[in-house]
Swiss-Prot record:
InterPro entries: UPF0212 (IPR007564). The lineage of its organism: Archaea, Methanobacteriati, Methanobacteriota, Stenosarchaea group, Halobacteria. Belongs to the UPF0212 family. It holds the Pfam family DUF555. This is UPF0212 protein VNG_0879C. NCBIfam families: PRK03922.1.
């Protein structure tokens, strides 16, 4: 059994905001609060980055229209003692998905973590 770092992308809807910086701040705060309420404080929440189609430069993953924003968030956690990377993905989506109901989640990266000590089963 191995440990895996699983990164997921979440689409977070924020209403009544006037700029993308405010939308990102609200999205990160709300996601963090919902995760912490479910004792998932080990999940890291960050604003997502998307590449500019013209130049490839990284841009904040936030789209704003009519004072409503869709913010892309990156959620990252370590899954201990998983049988495979697919097993780690299922565990991560189950843990985070339970706290963030009705929030679309997609696994974007899974890395086997050889540095983290395995927890006792």
């Amino acid at each position: 059994m191995s440990n895996y770092v699983v990164a997921m992308e979440a689409a977070w809807l924020v209403r009544d905001v006037e700029n993308s910086d405010d939308a990102i701040g609200v999205a990160v705060s709300e996601a963090g609060k919902r995760l912490n309420d479910q004792d998932l404080d080990y999940v890291e929440v960050e604003a997502g980055v998307t590449g500019c189609p013209a130049c490839g430069e990284g841009l904040d993953a936030a789209f704003l229209a009519a004072n409503t924003a869709l913010v892309g968030l990156v959620l990252e956690l370590t899954v201990f003692n998983a049988d495979s990377d697919e097993h780690a993905q299922r565990i991560a989506k189950s843990e985070v998905g339970g706290a963030l109901r009705d929030v679309p989640l997609e696994v974007i990266d899974v890395i086997e973590d050889g540095d983290a000590p395995a927890e006792e089963a």
